[in-house]
Amino acid sequence: MTEDNNDIVDIVDNIDIVDYISIYQKAYSIVGDKTPLNTDCGVLCSKICCESEYTDGDRGMFLFPEEERMYDDLPYWVELKPTEIEYAPGKNIILAVCNGKCDRERRPLACRIFPLAGVINTDNKLRIIMDIRGKSMCPIVFAMQVDEIDVSFVKSVTKALKYLLPFREIKAFLQYTDELINEDQTINNMFM
C-alpha cells in the first residue's frame, strides 16, 4: 500500500463519515458472479447455502463491520441478529440468518466469498484460506484445498478483501476471523 493510501485511511477511518454502502457495493462488484467451481457447486450440497431448509435461528453468516447498512430496508429473507461476540473492543459481530431463500444479488460478503475466508494473522498479512467453520455443510471445505478452487474466484476474493483492508474496522474483523478459525481448527484437531 502506498503512503498516500495510508493517509486516506487516517482521514476516512471515522466510522461516521465512511460510506460503507459504497465500499461494500464495490467489494461485491469485485467478486461479481464468480463461484468456487466452474460448475454449479450447489449440485454438491443441494444448494444448502441459498435454497435450503437447513436454516434455524442460530445458523448464519457473520456480517463484515457496518455491512448491516446494506440491509437498512431489511429484506424478507434475512434477519440480522446482534451477537455478544466482539471482534474489537465495543464492536460486536452481527449475524445474518436467512430463511433459506436468499436473494443472490443482496447476499452478504461472507456468503459471496464462501467457502473461503480472509484472515490477517500475526504476521499482519492477508491470507485467503478455506473456511473450515463450514465443513459440516460444504463438501468443498471438506474435500478441497484453496489451490483447487477456481483461480478467478480466488483472485476476485483476494482483490475484494485487499480493497477493504485500509478500513481499520474491517482489518480488525479479519484479524478476529483468524482467531476464530484457529480456535475451530484446534478443537477439530483434538477429535481427529
Regions found by a protein language model. Give the residues of each.
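Short loop/turn segments that flank or connect secondary-structure elements
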Residues: 1-192
